[in-house]
């Protein structure tokens, strides 16, 4: 719909993980926890998502966003399309409703987790310099399990 008045707003609350903030997207309903000292320098105009960056330097970033699955893509189609587009062999994993694809490009590690539903898609991408992989890997281990998709069976 063109009217945004009925759209729930984003929420930031205390996470069950100590020292973390829980972000819940008002439009798509997905949520993710991130370290308290990280900043949110970018919020998309259409309410689809945000960018979260390390306060110490912006080399470590978490992007989360949702989009409607208007093309009716399946999990396998989304996954294969991304791997093909990037064209880099990396780490992959998948479940019934999600996949993970992690690879290295231009000196950066990019870790993507995506939930694909018939109505909508929720995506999280964490990226960091290869030189900071110990910090980045630990961030992925802490943050990735907190990423919950909301209701992807419907469009938002």
PLM feature spans:
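Sec-exported extracytoplasmic/periplasmic mature domains
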Residues: 39, 80, 84-87, 145-152
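Extracytoplasmic/periplasmic, Sec-exported soluble proteins
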Residues: 15, 26, 30, 67-71, ...
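Surface-exposed amphipathic alpha-helical segments
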Residues: 121-156
């Amino acid at each position: 719909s063109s009217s945004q008045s009925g759209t729930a707003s984003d929420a930031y609350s205390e996470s069950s993980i100590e020292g973390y903030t829980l972000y819940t997207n008002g439009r798509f309903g997905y949520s993710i926890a991130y370290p308290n000292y990280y900043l949110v320098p970018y919020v998309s105009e259409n309410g689809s998502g945000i960018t979260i960056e390390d306060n110490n330097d912006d080399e470590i970033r978490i992007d989360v966003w949702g989009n409607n699955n208007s093309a009716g893509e399946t999990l396998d189609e989304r996954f294969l399309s991304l791997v093909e587009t990037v064209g880099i062999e990396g780490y992959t994993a998948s479940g019934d409703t999600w996949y993970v694809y992690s690879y290295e490009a231009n000196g950066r590690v990019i870790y993507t987790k995506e939930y694909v539903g018939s109505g909508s898609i929720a995506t999280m991408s964490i990226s960091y310099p290869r030189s900071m992989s110990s910090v980045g890997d630990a961030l992925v281990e802490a943050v990735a399990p907190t990423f919950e998709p909301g209701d992807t069976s419907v469009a938002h």
